[in-house]
Design a protein with these regions (language model features):
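S-adenosyl-L-methionine/SAH cofactor-binding core of RNA-modifying enzymes
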Residues: 48-121
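Short, well-ordered alpha-helix to beta-strand connector turns
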Residues: 35, 77-79, 126-127
Length: 187
């Protein structure tokens, strides 16, 4: 997470009109579950703005940026590349190895999450092709499960710096307060 070697998420591909919500949720999930930044394709500007707005309101640290060359990001990444795909090795068989590379060896991780059909060169360039259940499902779900396994649940306890507001956990109802007032609302 934020004290460790970097974890970045690359959204590979974005179909305007079709992928707006999913691309945004890739970014929001990356932020909420411990990644340091997300890189969106350059045609995903609305997703970028939404993720930046949420980070401004609910805290960070987290960066969101656009890239005009996502394949170059993979090729030039200085660290390990994990491609999340339903065709990869089972997450439960490789998560410890990936965690060791990240935690013990200090390797930065780039998590690649596809949209449309992913070209074969991504499979070849990845250090790991990882499948969460090896069944068709949402790339957001795959990213969430992978990040939780990578951080072993530590991401669920993170503090949010520079937040304008804070959600107060409740059994029933919804409560959002100014961040400065959050401590007096926690039991």
């Amino acid at each position: 997470m934020h004290d460790d070697s970097e974890v970045a998420v690359l959204r590979l591909g974005h179909r305007p009109g079709r992928d707006e919500r999913m691309t945004t949720h890739v970014g929001l999930t990356a932020r909420a579950l411990g990644a340091d930044r997300v890189l969106f394709p350059d045609n995903a500007g609305q997703s970028l703005e939404t993720v930046r707005d949420i980070t401004d309101r609910f805290g960070g640290p987290f960066e969101a940026e656009l890239t005009d060359s996502p394949h170059a990001v993979i090729r030039n990444w200085e660290g390990q590349v994990v491609h999340l795909t339903m065709y990869g090795e089972r997450v439960q068989d490789v998560d410890a190895e990936i965690r060791t590379a990240h935690d013990s060896e200090g390797e930065a991780l780039l998590l690649v999450v596809g949209s449309e059909k992913v070209s074969f060169d991504v499979y070849e360039e990845a250090d790991w092709n990882v499948g969460v259940t090896n069944q068709p499902h949402s790339e957001v779900a795959g990213l969430a499960v992978f990040l939780d396994r990578l951080f072993e649940g530590r991401e669920l306890e993170q503090d949010w710096a520079d937040a304008d507001r804070t959600v107060i956990p409740m059994e029933t109802g919804k409560r959002v307060v100014p961040a400065d007032d959050a401590d007096e609302h926690h039991e």
